[in-house]
Structures are given as C-alpha cells and as structure tokens.
Amino acid sequence: MTIVYLSLGTNMGDRAAYLQKALEALADLPQTRLLAQSSIYETTAWGKTGQADFLNMACQLDTQLTAADFLKETQAIEQSLGRVRHEKWGSRTIDIDILLFGEEVYDTKELKVPHPYMTERAFVLIPLLELQSDLKLPPNHKFLRDYLAALDQSDITLFSAQQTEF
C-alpha cells in the first residue's frame, strides 16, 4: 500500500458539493481507501486573477494502484464532474492534484510528483499539513512546514472546519 496526498480545488458552481462528490468518488476507487480529509479553505485564484475564489482542501489515501493508474482514476473523476481543460490555471469544477505518492518521485510528461508547485502554494500546504504536520518533501526531505513559513497566507480563510476520518 502507498500513502497518497491529494489537493482538491474548485471555483465553479456549488463548490462545496463538488469537493464532496470528488471525495466520494475517491473513496470508491478500486484498491484504495480514503483515510482523512482536511478542513476546507477559501482562497483567491492563483496563477490567473479575475476569476472566482477557490475552495481548497487536501486528503490522504492508501492505495495499491500504481501512480500512473491512480492519475488516470483522478482524471476520470475530474471529467465525470465536468472538468474541462481549456485554459491553464482557469476556472474549474474540480481539480485533483497528486501532491505526494509515498516517497516516490516521478518526472514524466503526464505526472510530476512531488507536485512541482506545491511548495509555492500556501493554499496547498495549509490543508496538507493539517493532515500530517511532519511531512517531508522527497527526495530532499525538507519539512513542508518550512516552505509554508516562507509563504504569504493572508488570502486564505477557513471555510469549513470539518475534518473527517474514514
């Protein structure tokens, strides 16, 4: 089994409902168990301004799937929830990013793990560290909380403090 950490985000429609539907779909993945979810945070858009605010959260799973198969499953969930990939950093019904896949490192066209921008995004690190405060970034094993300490967190507000274990 491999412990996987995901970031989920949405800024279209009923944002909280999209997060819930994504969590339900993740919990139903084959050979995978949803272990925990973070609180939900509201943040301004990153990368492209002038769009609606995002709701962001993280979750922790345990899977027997390969990283490539897990990516295919998360992309299928995104598509089933209406995700259309037409613009980089554009609005979306749901975005599911693989942040960490065990201690593994991937650098392919399809998959980059650890996620290449995670250390630059407080809206990713805050919910992620809520799940596991002593996470380290492979392969250098620097604490993720050290990256967070260097980031501006002023535009991130708690939306829902629900933290559920499965």
Swiss-Prot record:
Belongs to the HPPK family. It catalyses: 6-hydroxymethyl-7,8-dihydropterin + ATP = (7,8-dihydropterin-6-yl)methyl diphosphate + AMP + H(+). Pfam families: HPPK (PF01288). The gene is folK. Catalyzes the transfer of pyrophosphate from adenosine triphosphate (ATP) to 6-hydroxymethyl-7,8-dihydropterin, an enzymatic step in folate biosynthesis pathway. This is 2-amino-4-hydroxy-6-hydroxymethyldihydropteridine pyrophosphokinase. It comes from Streptococcus pyogenes serotype M6 (strain ATCC BAA-946 / MGAS10394). GO terms for molecular function: 2-amino-4-hydroxy-6-hydroxymethyldihydropteridine diphosphokinase activity; ATP binding; kinase activity. Keywords: ATP-binding, Folate biosynthesis, Kinase, Nucleotide-binding, Transferase.
